[in-house]
Amino acid sequence: DPTVLQVGINLGNILLVTGKKANGDPEGIAPDMAAAIAEKLGINVKFNTFATPGEVADAAERGEWDIGLIAIEPKRAEVIDFCNAYVQIEATYLVPEASSFQKVEDVDAPGVKIAVSERAAYDLYLSRTLKHAELVRAQGLPGAFELFKREKLDALAGLVPALRDNAADMPGSRLLPGRYTAVKQAIGTRHGKPALKAVVQAFIADAVSSGFVQGLIDKHGVTGKLAVATDD
């Protein structure tokens, strides 16, 4: 239906989808960005929601959305044409208070076991970059946190805002300073949609430079947890 923009939304990112409207539509920065793009195109918006980013990526192959709001990741680029990022979230580790680790780089050592949410952008990143440490995967962030506690693993990989919440729930744990990556949250189109991609790309550039994105960060109460994307 050319009068409707089908949008793939990842409900698993609680910073970008912060709630639900009375009509059941998702609420937050990601839905607001998508709605603004639909408005620019002069068409209606329809949200197709998924529990995890991996499911959003899988749905691209089935043609279930026109634009998807999901973190940029080389593996996902096989099925998605990414535009530039609009926000970024830094990723680090949560470790036990008594851990010898003092900075992010210390964690990649032989024998180290890291709990991680399966197929999260930082799981894909760490899978490519870790030389020695072993990733132990669980379903979703809550699952990775439980695994970390239950199995007494050496570290929990995650995004700073979520790890802060985990640390508050787990006395005797601390976040390592620094980051191993910043997850870039972007908007992508399915392959073979160059005209739509051009519109989205132009919209993001304007939204970042005009302060529209920062305004959404403030509006949805995630200031200090999300940052407007940088080019690095």
Residue map of PLM features:
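Alpha-to-beta junction loops
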Residues: Q6, G42-N44, E61-I70, G111-K113, ...
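Short helix-initiation/N-cap motifs at beta->coil->alpha
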Residues: P31, K46-D58, F101-Q102, V136-R150, ...
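Periplasmic-binding protein-like
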Residues: L11, V87-A98, V160, R164-A205, ...
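Ligand-binding clefts/hinges and TM-proximal coupling segments of bilobed small-molecule sensing domains
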Residues: A121-A138, L175-L176, A205-D232
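Short loop->beta-strand "edge-of-pocket" segments that line small-molecule binding or catalytic clefts
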Residues: V4-L11, E27, E105-A120, E134-L135
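Extracytoplasmic small-molecule ligand-binding "clamshell" domains
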Residues: D1-A71, R76-E78, S210, K219
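A ligand-binding cleft/hinge motif common to bilobed small-molecule-binding domains
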Residues: G54, I70-V79, Y125-R128, K149-T181
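Flexible hinge/capping segments at coil-to-helix
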Residues: N84-Y86, V95-K113
